[in-house]
Each structure stands twice: as C-alpha cells, then as structure tokens.
C-alpha cells in the first residue's frame, strides 16, 4: 500500500523507493477533452464579438431587415434538421420518415368529404360546433386523410409534438366517461390499422402510437368502474374472468393463484378469450406490445420498421374500424342481472355529459378566463354554467306579502283553495344595449365587499330575519291549465319527477373489483 496521493513509479522498477507524487485536481479539464476550437480560439472570442457588434452598428435599416430574413431562413433550416432527429437515443436520422410514398403507390384516393384539414384540427385540438368527425370506414382506410395526419405530425417540431402529446394524455386521464375513452382507443386502433394495411413505416413518437400504452391503462380504469365480476358472471366464474382481465392489463393479482402467468395471458390472441371486453383489451395490449418491439428494433438497427414484421397473430389485419365500440356495447347491452347497483354503474359509465352542476358562483365577466364553454351535445347545449348578466330583477317563484296582488286574498276567500302557479317565466337578459356604466352585478359585488369589512349591526340582523319570515312559498301543482300554456313560448315547465335509485352515492362500497 502507498500513501494517499503517491503512486509507484513505472520507470524505475529496480529502485524500491522510487515514488512520484500525483497532483489531484478535479476542476481542471483534461487536455484530451478540450476541443480544437477551444485550443485555438479561446482568447479570440471577445474581439470577434466586439467586431460583430461594430459591424451591426454600421448597418442601415434596410440591411438589418435583410439580415433578419436571412436569420429566419437559417432558423427554419435548423428546425428542419432538428426535426429530422428522433427522440429516441443514438439515432442520428429518422428511420421512419419515408417520403417516397404517394397516393398512387399506396392506392389511395383524395379525400373530398366535409372533415376539416388535418393542420387546422391539430392546431385547434378539439372539433368546432357542428363539425363532422364521424367518418366512414372507406373514408378512413381508402383516402389520404390519415396520410395527411401522418405528414402533419411528422412535420411538427419536438416542442410542438410534446405539447400535443401532453394535451392528449391529459384528456385521456381526465376522460368524462367510458364512451369518450372507447372513441379515443378506436381512433388509435384505426390509425394502427391504416399503417398495417398500406405497409407504412411506424413512427414510435407519433401522437397516436406514443399514447397507446396510456390508453391501455385508462381503458381498464374506466371499465373497472363497472361491476365486472357481475358482468363476467353470465357464463359463470366471474371472479376468475375478472382476474384474467387484470393479468391482461398488467395489474397485480395477489389474492388467488391463476393457472397462467401474466406473460402467457398477454401473448394470447383475442379470439382465445371468452368475453368481448377481454377481446377488446387484448387488441389494445397486442398493439402496445408490437409498438414496444418496434421501438427496440429501431434503436438497434436504425432502419424503418413495419407492423407486419411483428404482428405474428395478424391482429391488425383482422381488426375492423368500430370493432371496439361493438365489443363493449355487446358486453354491456347483453348483460342482464337483478343487481340494481350493477345496472346503475353501467348506465353511468356509458352515458356521457350527465349534469352534475346545478348552480355556479362564477360571474359572466370571469367565465372566459376559465374557458367554461366546452362543446356539449345538442341535447345539453341549453345548460348554462355561468350566471347571466341581468340588469333587472328576474321573476322567481318566491315573493313577499307586499309584492303579492290584492286579488290573491279574494281568491282564497271565494274558492277556499290557494292559487296555483304551474309555470315560471324566464326573462331573457337584454344584451343588445352596451353601456360603460356599471351593471347591477358589479354594484352588488362592490357593496358585498364593503359590507364584508363592516361589523354587523344587531338591528340589521333582526330586520333581515323578520324580512325573511315574510316570504311566502307558492305551491306548485302538476296539473297545467290549457289557458296558461298559450300565454308565452318562453315559459318553462317545472318537472319534479326523480328516480329513487339516483340517491345512491357510494358505488364501490360492496364491490370487490375496485383497486
């Protein structure tokens, strides 16, 4: 052993006491790692920078504008070069950017339908109102629509692609219902089918390809909200079939020993499973496994890879557009049981946009900041999630004794029964007149902010309590008089019917399928 910082000399082997001291320095860079530019031009960087600044000061405005256009062109060239580099490591060029294919070589025809241009759709992220997004199978597989989507996705920069994938993953993880998740999975599977049908090279960093694994887990999470042990119990052994689904998705099964391992279940073909939900999940798992193998092969070979070389079971070839929706709908529509909670769960996960917000505290001027205007279906577009701007006090079903007409007391005396009010008139706010003065809503906000800072007066509290006691509740009767029906088209019937089973709040209390 030698002292710290001392090493035996290799030049004088005959001398036992020949040592040399090693200078330990971790801050100084080794000479072999210094580039040629740093060796020769390290001391000349400052003069070059000053020289460039002096040249820029001598340029005129016209020359500066020309220089600006040249810089923008160079930036576009740099972006194109950076776009040619894949996100996968150790790949100098993109092996899947094959630009040699054309419509004639692929056997496609130009799309002339009502769907918008793919560039606009990718830019807007979501469809506009009354926009056509439901396409036929021939329009998806036999036209150049998906090919244009592929070309648009390949032309995105790395930052734009990451932003687009982040938005898609966020929408998947926050899906409102199973119907939206199934539609998203169907979209990715159709895109996968298009690449297999026309033998296109796969881009692993594609928007639809990259998020297949996320779709698999979110698809299972939405299905798991149903009582799958009851759904799979149509042919018996519901618990075992549910555990097979967990193995298929890669979820742990620890409470029971299964005959097959997780890897063996995932390598089975969709036809080997009994239930349609298992077959749909097997298709997604197979596509995710094929894409993972393609990624590994691209890193090793640095060559374009195709789905046909990895799809040994020909799952993509036998897949049809709309198959996922048919399998899920077939499973839930054919399920019949006496369990009320099971039926309620199926109805809730399949029916989107069920209203769950009954009043809102947002004011109309604050609504655009939060973007509270999503694209709802037509039957739910009449729902308002913001408070309208009303300058006058609207009519309501509650009124004080002073506001009631005097004839109402006579009617009680003559007929002996209270007057029935069957409808409520909804006054529409007049938004045609725009003034710079403060609205009633803004004045009320300022007054409420002023009163919050004051100490409450006991006399005012007693007066408000006495004023609230004067409120009279008008009874609402279901019988509607034909005379009042033709008074106004703006009137709205009050429907007080409700279902008894909607009072159920704890859905996962008695289920064994929740994680």
UniProtKB/Swiss-Prot annotation:
The keyword Transcription applies. Signal peptide: none annotated. A zinc finger (CHC2-type) spans 230-342. GO terms for cellular component: host cell cytoplasm; host cell nucleus; viral tegument. It holds the Pfam family Herpes_UL69. One of its GO terms (biological process) is regulation of DNA-templated transcription. Its main location: virion. Residues 409-422 have a biased composition (Basic residues). Residues 398-422 are annotated as: Disordered. GO terms for molecular function: zinc ion binding. Zn(2+) binds at residues 230, 335, 337, 342. InterPro entries: ICP27-like. Residues 398-408 have a biased composition (Polar residues). It is found in: Virion tegument; Virion; Host nucleus; Host cytoplasm. Keywords: Host cytoplasm, Host nucleus, Metal-binding, Transcription, Transcription regulation, Virion, Virion tegument, Zinc, Zinc-finger. Immediate early (EI) protein that plays many roles during productive infection including regulation of viral gene expression and nuclear export of intronless viral RNAs. Belongs to the HHV-1 ICP27 protein family. This is mRNA export factor ICP27 homolog. It comes from Human herpesvirus 6A (strain Uganda-1102) (HHV-6 variant A).
